[in-house]
Amino acid sequence: MAESFVRLEHVFYKYEDTEKYAVKDVSISAQKGEWVALVGHNGSGKSTIAKLLNGLLFPEDGLIKIGHFVLSEKNIWEIRRQVGMVFQNPDNQFVGATVQDDVAFGLENHGVPHDTMVERVESALNEVGMQSYALHEPARLSGGQKQRVAIAGVLALQPDVIILDEATSMLDPRGRAEVMETIRIMREQEDITVISITHDLDEVLFADRVIVMNNGEIHSEGTPKEIFEQADAMRAIGLGVPFIIELQEKLVAGGFETGSTVLSEGALLDQLWKLNSNN
């Protein structure tokens, strides 16, 4: 098996104003091109892990490795070149007067030659479907469009890892769907590792693997199907389950046979049709 591209080993971290560990003995790994979702209630440690992965925080104990680099003050900038981060509020990330200026900002800071910069900006905006808005002011965009521009700014830097820190939490359903589809396509085309930090359990269904955090520790880990088959365990720590899982539970409670757990409405309809056809 290939070595993990992202690795946390027995990581501990606590903030200065508290005695309680925000992250306690956490070990996580992710392969190149894998999508890993971290879920948990507020205070579970998931956003602290996002900041640790990008070197915004340093662990009190344990090891964090991205690619060939172990996180330290010496190589923090090597880590940040490999890791792009998209935050909850895209307005906090905008610095340019136009969309293309904003996407170019990070490249300028990295000293990328002008001709290369122009190519990367155009390519990144095309990838997120925002090339026609290149000369627009970011402030005039919708929430979903703003977040796609923020993603383009990260893509232009050609990172190996993208961290989504509650990146869709302020968007309406349409904007959320736009952003998640953009990330899905981007990951397939660029083989980028995606670490999504979220409390949106429908968003978790996009992931290859889910890590459930509770009180700074890993509560459980598995595929989305494996995690949501433990619906009662999720509810016991203050989390819910996606709508599609709730729908199956209600059908079973109403006396309908639904078969094995599925994660999409289309798959559920197919399953119900087959079961009904056999009766």
Swiss-Prot record:
Coiled coil: none annotated. Its EC number is 7.-.-.-. Keywords: ATP-binding, Cell membrane, Membrane, Nucleotide-binding, Translocase, Transport. ATP binds at residues 40-47. InterPro entries: AAA+_ATPase, ABC_transporter-like_ATP-bd, ABC_transporter-like_CS, ABC_transpr_CbiO/EcfA_su, ECF_ABC_transporter_ATP-bd, EcfA_1, P-loop_NTPase. It is found in: Cell membrane. PANTHER family: ENERGY-COUPLING FACTOR TRANSPORTER ATP-BINDING PROTEIN ECFA1 (PTHR43553:SF24), HEAVY METAL TRANSPORTER (PTHR43553). ATP-binding (A) component of a common energy-coupling factor (ECF) ABC-transporter complex. Unlike classic ABC transporters this ECF transporter provides the energy necessary to transport a number of different substrates. Forms a stable energy-coupling factor (ECF) transporter complex composed of 2 membrane-embedded substrate-binding proteins (S component), 2 ATP-binding proteins (A component) and 2 transmembrane proteins (T component). This is Energy-coupling factor transporter ATP-binding protein EcfA1.
